[in-house]
Amino acid sequence: MLEDTQLVWVRDAAEGYIQGRITEIGAKEFEVTPTDRKYPKRTCHFDDIHSSCDGPQDHDDNCELMLLNEATFLDNLKTRYYKDKIYTYVANILIAVNPYREIKELYAPDTIKKYNGRSLGELPPHVFAIADKAIRDMRVYKLSQSIIVSGESGAGKTESTKYLLKYLCYSHDSAGPIETKILDANPVLEAFGNAKTTRNNNSSRFGKFIEVHYDAKCQVVGGYISHYLLEKSRICTQSAEERNYHVFYMLLAGAPQQLRDKLSLGKPDDYRYLSGCTQYFANAKTEQLIPGSQKSKNHQQKGPLKDPIIDDYQHFHNLDKALGRLGLSDTEKLGIYSLVAAVLHLGNIAFEEIPDDVRGGCQVSEASEQSLTITSGLLGVDQTELRTALVSRVMQSKGGGFKGTVIMVPLKIYEASNARDALAKAIYSRLFDRIVGLINQSIPFQASNFYIGVLDIAGFEYFTVNSFEQFCINYCNEKLQKFFNDNILKNEQELYKREGLNVPEITFTDNQDIIELIEAKSNGIFTLLDEESKLPKPSYSHFTAEVHKSWANHYRLGLPRSSRLKAHRTLRDEEGFLVRHFAGAVCYNTEQFIEKNNDALHASLEGLVQECDNPLLQTLFPSGSSTSVRGKLNFISVGSKFKTQLGELMEKLEQNGTNFIRCIKPNSKMIDRQFEGSLALAQLKCSGTISVLELMEHGYPSRVLFADLYSMYKSVLPPELVSLPARTFCEAMFQSLNLSAKDFKFGITKVFFRPGKFVEFDRIMRSDPENMLAIVAKVKKWLIRSRWVKSALGALCVIKLRNRIIYRNKCVLIAQRIARGFLARKQHRPRYQGIGKINKIRTNTLKTIEIASGLKMGREEIISGVNDIYRQIDDAIKKIKMNPRITQREMDSMYTVVMANMNKLTVDLNTKLKEQQQAEEQERLRKIQEALEAERAAKEAEEQRQREEIENKRLKAEMETRRKAAEAQRLRQEEEDRRAALALQEQLEKEAKDDAKYRQQLEQERRDHELALRLANESNGQVEDSPPVIRNGVNDASPMGPNKLIRSENVRAQQQALGKQKYDLSKWKYSELRDAINTSCDIELLEACRQEFHRRLKVYHAWKAKNRKRTTMDENERAPRSVMEAAFKQPPLVQPIQEIVTAQHRYFRIPFMRANAPDNTKRGLWYAHFDGQWIARQMELHADKPPILLVAGTDDMQMCELSLEETGLTRKRGAEILEHEFNREWERNGGKAYKNLGAAKPNGPAAAMQKQQ
């Protein structure tokens, strides 16, 4: 078990992430025990584990999270979702989670007023805050704005768009007639363009860009709606759980009886075009108002569909009123309802074969005669002509006269059915175009300065059967994702580089290759489809084959059998293709691509409706619009038209300021109070929001040019401030407002603000005169104060400089005095020492005279002898003083002669005293002898000390020699590496690109799998594993293992070296490795365990560093930064066993600088004792805290995990110290003595060391 049991987030297939604790460090994975016992223990790769904070997180802006990672991001969304806080920021991007219910007062008029004019971040996140930011940015920057609302189907894009428009129209004043009409457009567009799908009850089946135009005073003056790609196939067919467009059901449920009679309307069961779900949306009240004759059998059995937003009966009346407010008369509204009803009746016209007709023609069935009559009446065409146009078409040959021969070509049943459906689609789609045109006519603008555009377009779609509509929708989403990547990720990072902000680079998946695959001019899918459609006999199988042929080796395009969904693998190669989109792989069935790409009718059918009596239908199909020969099928490319429209939209978005709202679908069942973590996480990843979170950890989303900020204030600046440079003025402004230096950063041309600091930013950018004058006054005050402070500091600096010069002069004199004294002592020290040595004899003679004074006999003789010795001493000293070049040998000879005479005199004295005072003299002589012995012992001790000092100097010199040799070897190795690096640089760059590409492919495979699982759950299908990704000839299913990157040559060589070792420790637990280190006597096993043990420690500490808290100081540094960084400058080496056995103990001491500590406590010392290649003891000394002493075997998690070679300590000058120096500090600070466990391990590693109890 690990001692470090911090909370972590670990990946889970259902919840996204769950909390747990790391209990084991494996060779390649961590073992995590979930805190919730209903989840089993699991082992996961390091990349699937993230640090966790204690306690739940609830932050308005995800950039405020203490730990910024996708797990804490998801947890914050989930926590807020269950608190009904559905909005969250990522910097200035709004994340909106669909609550699937109404939240009280969330969009009330009072809420609109509350957000009016308030800075982003000043109030809780809200869609109104984004709308208000767009208005203020438009006003300040004099630039039109766009709000892009994106997300999956059912994520809440349509509702977010409605509330955005509501705020834009109601925020400043009560809505006038123009604002009311803009808002009335929503129910009309939803009725004709929205439908129930399996994933969304109110799914927009078209895209729209709604522009709200403003004048110079920022008052609404008009609007304009652009729409894209209405899903026409839904008009004729729907799946069992889906419905046609809402307007059909509204008309059947809510139309008055008189209108229903006029339009001959019945119940949904009566119409082939309503063959899907036939239930109405209704609540308890409106259910009673719908006549029973209008209810389908299914509705009567199961009851109505429930939705808090949709009600077919009520919405028909809302639609009728909205059309009236948009300026349509009752006659015009009746014309619209008539065409809607005509489409329903047209769908009921069926065909049957004509008996005995050899040409294979067909006729309208007898049961459909009534539907034919009603349809012709509603369309205003002759019944016979309609019948003829549906079952045949007229063609005109090229020869046989001036105009050629007219030929009546009968149609087969399926051809007639296709013609009928094409007419229905044409009528409805052109009616939709007309309605959008009427809305635009009702909200015209004469003069517009700026506009705010809201983009709501169908989200990424994937079904069991995907056709041309899904292909176009997903292509659009690819373009929007590319715009998001460029606008937020790519361009943002390029701006940071240009401005020199030193923001770490964030990698993201660029989907430009998918867009090129679809829209390339020469061989893009759209181009190939158009070319196929122009052929005399187009074939979808030939088109599909051309797609596969043109893009045979493109990673983004695959065969249907490569899909993970079993249902898709049944398609033949010529029946479809698979595209790996940014959100996941989608398999498209191409059977109807050619038909759906053609937006034209047979000329005979178009001519029929052009000559009708219905005025509205004549408007939809104006005469002269078709220039084709009668009977020929025109070709109008839907794909090319959509691509052109999308290109124009992208140009608009690129010219505008941009705001993003990312809508998130919390669950697939569309119910409230349920949050599926894996589903939400997949959406966040696919939308690029996770990458934005990583970028904004260091990013600055708000910025303004120095020049723009200065020009904004220039008009109110006093004369003394006008001459200031723009940057100087901005710096003075920020200092005067007491803004924290962490909240902003100055670039080369702009000032940038951190996320969540929009209040301060808006405070500066607010252009009202009172605010500007107040800021200018503060700037002036700060400038005056700062100049006085600078003057005072200047004077103080001059005084300090003068004192420094005086101090240096004194230091020079002291240094000179010391140097002269040192030189003199060095020159004369031997003579000083010789004189001192001889003078010691003079001192001994005093005792001799004292003893001789007590003699009764021979006193004069002894004193005479002493005087002779004095003369000898004086003569010797005089000779030494007079002869500067006297040698040590000569001085020793003089000392020996004098000492011999002294000894002789002492012997005589002893002889004379022996008889007189034998006992007393013997005691005195013993003391003299002891003094002489003590002197001799002191002399020997001094000589021993000098020898030890010389030995220590020799050892240090040897250490320095070794260091220099190692340094020279390192320099030579670096030179060799540099030369080799130049040769290998291209190869390494290629490998890096391959690694990045391969990682993207693995991430794409994971997304494909998740998407297939979601689709399989919806359709009760099966998911199969796709073929493994192959890279550089290595299959992921091979022994190399899944998801393994192909490393560089150095790394592969190290892996091979490790693989050849005697012991396989990959399956050993962390605790087993530590026990083996502490107990084993097998040297080879011991070292193998130590290498594996420290390798796992490195991986663990690298993971902790990556997932540390943003505010964490470097209190937990295990070694000085220079030591840790040295490991990245060279590859680790695998040390041979024979070198390990003879490894020696080495000791080091280097300064320890903590970057975040106060200045007075910043410096410390770090001591390390290495037993061979691995650390055995570690000590950290700081003045402000107790010493930290760590011992291997018990404190491994807190100790340096690098090998001695990796630390680079052996190459640091002055870093290595002697054993006694380390032990002296270790024991002084309370450390126990280091012990080896016996002779079995003479140079034992850390396992042989125990921390004494």
From Swiss-Prot:
UniProt GO molecular function: actin binding; actin filament binding; ATP binding; calmodulin binding; microfilament motor activity; microtubule binding; myosin light chain binding; myosin VI light chain binding
Stored Gene3D superfamilies: 1.10.10.820, 1.20.58.530, 3.30.70.1590, 6.10.220.10, Kinesin motor domain, Myosin S1 fragment, N-terminal, Myosin VI head, motor domain, U50 subdomain
Specify which residues bind ATP according to the UniProt entry for this protein: G151, E152, S153, G154, A155, G156, K157, T158
Instruction: Name a single GO cellular component.
Output: cytoplasm
Q: Does the keyword Coiled coil apply?
A: yes
Instruction: Enumerate the spans annotated as IQ domain.
Output: 808-837
Which ranges carry the Myosin N-terminal SH3-like domain? 3-54
Q: Which UniProt keywords apply?
A: Actin-binding, ATP-binding, Calmodulin-binding, Coiled coil, Cytoplasm, Cytoskeleton, Developmental protein, Motor protein, Myosin, Nucleotide-binding, Phosphoprotein
Q: List the residue ranges of the region (Disordered).
A: 1233-1253
UniProt key word Transmembrane helix: no
Q: What does this protein do?
A: Myosin is a protein that binds to actin and has ATPase activity that is activated by actin. Together CLIP-190 and jar may coordinate the interaction between the actin and microtubule cytoskeleton. May link endocytic vesicles to microtubules and may be involved in transport in the early embryo and in the dynamic process of dorsal closure. It is believed that its function changes during the life cycle.
Name listed for the protein in its UniProt record: Myosin heavy chain 95F
Q: Which organism is it from?
A: Drosophila melanogaster (Fruit fly)
What gene is it encoded by?
Answer: jar
